[in-house]
Amino acid sequence: EDRFSNIYDGFKAYPVTCTNDCYPASADIECESDMQNCQFVGNNPTVNSHTGFNVTWLGHASFLLNTASGEQILIDPVFGQFDWPVNWAFRLAEGFSRNEPAEVGEDKLAQTDAVVYSHIHYDHFNKADIAELGTKPEYLVPLGFAEHFPNRGYTIKEMAWYTSKSVGKTSIHFVPAHHFSNRIWVPYLYEDDNATLWGGWVFESEGKTLFFAGDTGYSPHF
């Protein structure tokens, strides 16, 4: 079976856990306990407010994007706890629960023109949220992604790297990232390593450009 791969393989080593090898200690981050309920306490840099985009952070890697030309786009929306079986495994192991972000109101969600996903990992794609988002927005997803949606009238556009789609007056381009994908692993029976593509997104509107890298390591693709 064909699987996807990074454009530039190179050396990559991903941490096994985030207990002690994920992030170095920093005076800018305070946690109640090891990696629990962490808050950024450092100085925020000055942000150029004339970017042409209005970006609202919804927690972790989820963003609500309003473009200069008036389109509303959700990026990697994950509103609640992670999908089964990850949420179940956390409870079974007495692990942590996700700090759920502030909810986006129904009226605001109803204005969404498109939803884009960078890859299929549980912290970026939550099946439980699809029913809430509904069939009104168009879904732009990496190759191999559509089969994870319910068969209920969703408008889904699977995209390869360096392909583009217009949503209203906003041009959206799918670009490479240096990462991997998987969602299901049953020892000796089934695995879906790199069965779906991954990447980042470039948004162009009214002469302005915004880049969402997705999950990525450094490589010449930048």
Spell out what each predicted region is:
Residues 1-114, 173-180, 193, 203-214:
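Metallo-beta-lactamase
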Residues 128, 181-222:
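Active-site-proximal loop/helix segments of hydrolase catalytic cores
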Residues 82, 120-125, 146-149, 163-166, ...:
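Active-site environment of divalent metal-dependent phosphoester hydrolases
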Residues 152-159, 171:
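Active-site regions of enzymes building and remodeling cell-envelope glycoconjugates
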Residues 65, 161-169, 203:
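Short acidic-hydrophobic surface loop/beta-edge motif
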Residues 59-60, 141-148, 160-162:
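Short, polar loop motifs at secondary-structure junctions
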